[in-house]
Amino acid sequence: AKMNVQGSKRMEALSKELDFSYKRNGSLVLCFEDADRSKLEELLEKAEKNGVEGCQIISGDEVRQMEPQVSDQVVAALYAPAGGIVCPFGLTIALAENACANGVEFFLNQEVQNIVKKDGYYEVCTQDHVYETKLVVNAAGVYADVFHNMVSEQKIQIIPRKGEYWIKK
């Protein structure tokens, strides 16, 4: 959560530097029942503890003033004005272009079959080659557990879940 706060503060400048779309539009966590207001209070407390600035709990009427299409059943919300959105594709391409410009080599169409932790480095074994590196970034999404478990004694399992993002223009 703390890294999320730091990243949010840096995102606007990064979007200008690397030329990708970014908009600080705030975020809302909606509450549909009075009995759940305490959960909003808990989220607010966590946000404040983690340094998220400007968060507040607002009424259902205030939510509908901000977002007229929100259900009449919403009784309250946690509003975080620092929330923002990016185009994930544009961000990814911008980061890859920047990495390439700074000397990163991409090895495409390589299936990682094993990762071996050595003294001070890793061997990343693919079907064609063994790469040696000091750092491995695990960006395998729902398959991240597979790569984690290759090098860690503490095994994990990721159980994929499906969710939705609604984009409003």
Predicted feature descriptions by range:
Residues 24, 74, 120, 127, ...:
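A generic structural signal for well-ordered coil/turn residues at beta-strand boundaries
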